[in-house]
Amino acid sequence: HTIHGRAPTVASGLKLANPELSVWMVTGDGDGFSIGGNHLIHLLRRNFNINVMLFNNRIYGLTKGQYSPTSEQGKVTYSTPMGSLDYPFKPTQLALGAQGSFVAKTIDKELKHLQSMIRRAHDHNGTSFIEIYQNCNIFNDGAFGTLTDRDTKADKLLYLENGEPMIFGNEKNKGIILDGSKPKVVEIGKKYSIDDILVHDETDSLLANMLSDFTAHDDFPEPLGVLYCSERPTYDDLMAAQMGDSKKQPTQTLDDMLNAVSYTHLRAHETV
């Protein structure tokens, strides 16, 4: 975890220094998206082979209950006694915008699902980002109550399975369709059949962005699972290859390196 918000920098250096380590970074909605927000987005875009677990309880827990970057608008806390004016971040949407190669979401009380997401993250070659909804029973108790309550969670959670239709509900009789370019919740068995339901494709970044926006709308279920997964070269692998190429080059002095490219050549390159 390191000091507040700086875990991505330490994790990146650790991975470069010892590539064989399985590096896991634990952060929260406060340090991850405020003081450490710049570090987190660059970790994601660089695609280090590092696993990120972001515990989101929509509050600053360690610093005694101030509102966080994911607190809902209107949230009353010690630091916002009249209600927060800020629009909250959507963590998975932010991770996708930072070009994360693996973006998933789960919740603390769904233990089997949490375990499966951790396994998937471990198996991914690149930066894996898991948002984990976590209840803070001191400063924000019940923040995710409708998603964990036995009587309501079936109608509020959409479990994503790659290649499977997006269905949910106690009777598995609700699903997601595209109405033009917009998602829509429908009931299966009347006007719509299972064949009309949108099928999840975790390699589709446009679909992942659409799903990440469900969080902002009460009439849509909360998607849990792998929203997006793609393979591309990792920063640590590219660095190792670059260092290998460098070692093959003739030995140079500092003056040789400084004079290797002329100022005139640089200016010409910039003009082009």
Predicted regions: what they are:
Residues 1-61, 115:
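Thiamine diphosphate
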Residues 35-39, 45, 62-68, 117, ...:
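Short acidic, glycine/serine/threonine-rich loops at helix termini
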Residues 97-147, 212-234, 240:
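Structural signature of the thiamine diphosphate
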Residues 132-224:
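Internal helical hairpin/lid segments
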Residues 20, 68-121:
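Conserved thiamine diphosphate
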Residues 71-81, 148-162, 246-252:
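Acidic, Ser/Thr-rich peripheral helices and adjacent loops at domain boundaries
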